């Protein structure tokens, strides 16, 4: 599982970096030729794309390293750090766009040959849609937070390129402030995406529990297993591709230790079949030692 995860995540990071570099060169030419502030917005975004994707590429490779003596739980948290760094990069580009857009709203300037800008934007739109489709497939397979953050960023690029097409079309017909207005709207959307991405990264760094649906699946597996009378103290978190799951099983007092161990092993394997690659810790408690107030299962 880890080999497949590493291969897919690395390919997604390389694809994003390569596409960002190619589009940057095209957008530099288009901005120089047309003077469009919307294309400048796209150019700045491509610079951020490159910085973010390179950060992803380096951090993902680090996060895939196996656990060592100093990092006994592995290096998966590096993915959350990459997502947090991306959110800061993107916020900076959004603020730059605000300033540039306001300046052009106050003093609009006609652009040269919007047709060139439209052609470049169509190319960027098609390439970005292809990349986002590939990234979405990788996220479904790996649940990588770094790739998900990159995908959210490029999804905003799809909307941005669509808005730029409209702005260039309006400018072509003499609505010169449309270029700056759309660039301002793009900046607002980019900032929103950055804040959302940063929030998710911080939650992961703070060891937020797995989604309710996944925790409920764990509860269902455990409480329906023969030999398990109940369960409590479920604790979960995720670091990179690895889910960490801890739970206490309640068993009959007179159950032999060997049999209790066998039941716990079976439950662990059942959880691993549902969530491959997880780190599962199970503690067995005799029913008589479980306080009455925690008999009823609660998510922790």
UniProtKB/Swiss-Prot annotation:
The chain crosses the membrane at residues 12-32, 39-59, 82-102, 114-134, 156-176, 178-198. It is a multi-pass membrane protein. Disulfide bonds: none annotated. It catalyses: Zn(2+)(in) + H(+)(out) = Zn(2+)(out) + H(+)(in); Cd(2+)(in) + H(+)(out) = Cd(2+)(out) + H(+)(in); Fe(2+)(in) + H(+)(out) = Fe(2+)(out) + H(+)(in). GO terms for molecular function: cadmium ion transmembrane transporter activity; ferrous iron transmembrane transporter activity; metal ion binding; zinc efflux antiporter activity. Belongs to the cation diffusion facilitator (CDF) transporter (TC 2.A.4) family. FieF subfamily. Divalent metal cation transporter which exports Zn(2+), Cd(2+) and possibly Fe(2+). May be involved in zinc and iron detoxification by efflux. Homodimer. This is Cation-efflux pump FieF. It comes from Salmonella arizonae (strain ATCC BAA-731 / CDC346-86 / RSK2980).
């Amino acid at each position: 599982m880890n080999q497949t995860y590493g291969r897919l995540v690395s390919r997604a990071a390389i694809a994003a970096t390569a596409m960002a570099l190619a589009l940057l060169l095209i957008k530099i030419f288009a901005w120089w030729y047309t003077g469009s502030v919307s294309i400048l917005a796209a150019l700045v975004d491509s610079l951020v794309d490159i910085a973010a994707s390179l950060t992803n590429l380096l951090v993902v490779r680090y996060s895939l390293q196996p656990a060592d003596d100093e990092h006994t739980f592995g290096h998966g948290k590096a993915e959350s750090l990459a997502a947090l760094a991306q959110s800061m990069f993107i916020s900076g580009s959004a603020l730059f766009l605000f300033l540039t857009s306001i300046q052009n709203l106050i003093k609009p300037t006609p652009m040269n040959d919007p047709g060139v800008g439209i052609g470049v934007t169509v190319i960027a739109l098609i390439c970005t849609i292809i990349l986002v489709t590939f990234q979405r497939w990788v996220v479904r397979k790996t649940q990588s937070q770094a790739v998900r953050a990159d995908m959210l960023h490029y999804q905003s690029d799809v909307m941005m390129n669509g808005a730029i097409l409209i702005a260039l079309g309006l400018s072509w017909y003499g609505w010169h402030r449309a270029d700056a207005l759309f660039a301002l709207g793009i900046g607002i959307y980019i900032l929103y995406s950055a804040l959302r991405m940063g929030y998710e990264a911080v939650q992961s760094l703070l060891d937020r529990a797995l989604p309710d649906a996944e925790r409920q699946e764990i509860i269902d597996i455990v409480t329906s297993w023969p030999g398990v009378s109940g369960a409590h103290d479920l604790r979960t978190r995720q670091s990179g591709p690895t889910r960490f799951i801890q739970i206490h099983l309640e068993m009959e007092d007179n159950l032999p230790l060997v049999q209790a161990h066998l039941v716990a092993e079976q439950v662990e394997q059942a959880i691993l079949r549902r969530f491959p690659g997880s780190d599962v810790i199970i503690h067995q408690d005799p029913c008589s030692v479980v306080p009455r107030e925690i008999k009823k299962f609660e998510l922790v």
